[in-house]
A protein has these predicted regions:
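Active-site-adjacent "lid/gating" segments in soluble enzymes
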Residues: 1-84, 88-89
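A generic structural signal for secondary-structure junctions
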Residues: 24, 48, 52, 99-102, ...
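A glycine-rich dinucleotide-binding beta-alpha-beta segment and adjacent secondary-structure elements
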Residues: 147-183
Length: 183
């Protein structure tokens, strides 16, 4: 389970989108709209990849944690000083990751050369990559991945989140006067 009530949050967002669409329709046509948002419907929509996989194949998907069901490697990996999310979206990016990790032959191995093959051999590939990634430091590795155009990011704890330069730039943490002289 994730730490927050995702159904409530996502239903609220869907509700706002639906209200905006209804207001736009009213502006264009003069007619109102009925907005119907249900938590169940919202959470079902959040299972987009798993739903489609099931509806197309008839196979019940297994739990994959942070891993993408259709793209490999696309999940959280442990590194020597934390964790990263690695989101390798295509075969070219996979070849770059393999070269960067000193495993260029892996990208030519028929078991891993295409995403379709990597999905079949997910378990073996994730172990191979994980063994190497655990030896690498997070920040240096992320810089190398970024330089190669491979999507990846840090998994931060909450103090790291609020120390992040982008979070600070976006002013996501507000200082509030609580009335007793403290913030």
């Amino acid at each position: 389970k994730v730490g927050v009530a995702m159904g409530d949050l996502c239903a609220g967002l869907y509700g706002v989108i639906a209200i905006q669409a209804a207001l736009a329709m009213r502006e264009r046509t003069g007619r109102g709209q009925h907005v119907d948002i249900a938590l169940l419907d919202t959470m079902l929509a959040m299972l987009a990849n798993q739903n489609l996989n099931f509806l197309v194949s008839g196979e019940v998907p297994t739990r994959l944690g942070s891993a993408h069901p259709n793209i490999v490697p696309y999940q959280v990996f442990a590194v020597s000083d934390g964790h990263i999310m690695l989101a390798v979206g295509n075969d070219g990016q996979f070849a770059k990751v393999c070269a960067l990790l000193g495993m260029p032959a892996l990208a030519k191995d028929p078991r891993y050369a295409t995403n379709a093959a990597r999905v079949v051999y997910r378990e073996q590939l994730v172990k191979l990559l994980g063994d190497v990634l655990r030896t690498r430091g997070r920040d240096a590795l992320l810089a190398e991945l970024e330089a190669q155009g491979v999507p990846a990011g840090p998994i931060n704890n909450i103090d790291q989140v609020f120390a992040d330069p982008q979070v600070r730039h976006r002013k996501m943490q507000l200082q509030l006067d609580v009335g007793d002289g403290t913030t």
